[in-house]
Amino acid sequence: MTSKSHWKLLALALVLVVVMVWYSISREDRYIEFFYFPISEKKEPCFQGEAERQASKIFGNRSREQPIFLQLKDYFWVKTPSTYELPFGTKGSEDLLLRVLAITSYSIPESIKSLECRRCVVVGNGHRLRNSSLGGVINKYDVVIRLNNAPVAGYEGDVGSKTTIRLFYPESAHFDPKIENNPDTLLVLVAFKAMDFHWIETILSDKKRVRKGFWKQPPLIWDVNPKQVRILNPFFMEIAADKLLSLPIQQPRKIKQKPTTGLLAITLALHLCDLVHIAGFGYPDASNKKQTIHYYEQITLKSMAGSGHNVSQEAIAIKRMLEMGAVKNLTYF
């Protein structure tokens, strides 16, 4: 082989390497997911009470006594005093809450209660779900928990089509419950303020709608079955803030730091399930101003400014839970 031919081959090899590196970076989500986190075809063994044991290490044993959803009897028959105001308690919102609990439900469906071992996945809204092809894997879990207005229709290949529980608050309720949920999906309200109770009451009772008191106008028409609506116990917001983020529970009114719905959903799953996996969690590096943060819309980290969420601190909390084995990740983190 001549020296000239040798250099041509080297140049061709170099071009191929550059193309491969460029392609892997341009398809970062799929590349990392495939290369570092292969999904086993076999179900991971599920051990009853395992998530609860892990949760007690983080949150303490007191959390075991708490109901997942708020119940009418605790506010109607027995006046349960709450130490904190929303979103960490119900102090000052009891009258509104009573009216909401009278028209909603609190039970955990028999299809979940009867499971010998509850295998759950919390599906985040992160960009890294795009092109992940995890839809089939996600659909195999007993309980699939989704967040806010994250769409399913059109993204089934990456995020699945099954939705057991969807956490939301009024400003994030801009989704069609008939299209993005299943008929038996539980719609779980995360209340941040008293007006959130007022909004859900007007929607479910078809009363005069409220338009003020929200940072974004919530839906005025929302076609849902009241018996599919639940009110999340704010205790879980409290322990997520306290035990995972070390946030002060009593904060000045102008400084309202709080966990994201995603971190709250993981906290909920650790108390409801026996095995907890997560997918689609994590944000781009703070220096990356152009990377979109969701799999379904073109918004960047800039949109998080003023949200009251500390995503860097949450990343540390999730990494801690991953390292101790409390949760496992289906996507890279």
Swiss-Prot record:
Tissue and organ expression note: Broadly expressed among tissues with highest levels in the small intestine and colon.
Entry-listed glycosylation sites: N61, N131, N310, N329
Record protein name field: CMP-N-acetylneuraminate-beta-galactosamide-alpha-2,3-sialyltransferase 4
Keyword flag Membrane: yes
Cited Gene3D superfamilies: Glycosyl transferase family 29
Reaction catalysed by this enzyme: a beta-D-galactosyl-(1->3)-N-acetyl-beta-D-galactosaminyl derivative + CMP-N-acetyl-beta-neuraminate = an N-acetyl-alpha-neuraminyl-(2->3)-beta-D-galactosyl-(1->3)-N-acetyl-beta-D-galactosaminyl derivative + CMP + H(+); a beta-D-galactosyl-(1->3)-N-acetyl-alpha-D-galactosaminyl derivative + CMP-N-acetyl-beta-neuraminate = an N-acetyl-alpha-neuraminyl-(2->3)-beta-D-galactosyl-(1->3)-N-acetyl-alpha-D-galactosaminyl derivative + CMP + H(+); a beta-D-galactosyl-(1->4)-N-acetyl-beta-D-glucosaminyl derivative + CMP-N-acetyl-beta-neuraminate = an N-acetyl-alpha-neuraminyl-(2->3)-beta-D-galactosyl-(1->4)-N-acetyl-beta-D-glucosaminyl derivative + CMP + H(+); a ganglioside GM1 (d18:1(4E)) + CMP-N-acetyl-beta-neuraminate = a ganglioside GD1a (d18:1(4E)) + CMP + H(+)
Disulphide bond pairs: C120-C273
Ranges annotated as spanning the membrane: 9-26
Keyword entries, A-Z: Disulfide bond, Glycoprotein, Glycosyltransferase, Golgi apparatus, Lipid metabolism, Membrane, Signal-anchor, Transferase, Transmembrane, Transmembrane helix
Coiled-coil regions listed in the entry: none
Cellular localization per UniProt: Golgi apparatus, Golgi stack membrane
Cytoplasmic topological segments: 1-8
GO biological process: cognition; glycolipid biosynthetic process; lipid glycosylation; oligosaccharide biosynthetic process; positive regulation of blood coagulation; positive regulation of leukocyte tethering or rolling; protein glycosylation; sialylation
Source species: Mus musculus
Gene null: resulting phenotype: Knockout mice suffer from bleeding disorders and thrombocytopenia due to deficient ASGPR-mediated clearance of plasma VWF/von Willebrand factor.
EC number(s) stated in the UniProt entry for this protein: 2.4.3.2, 2.4.3.4, 2.4.3.6
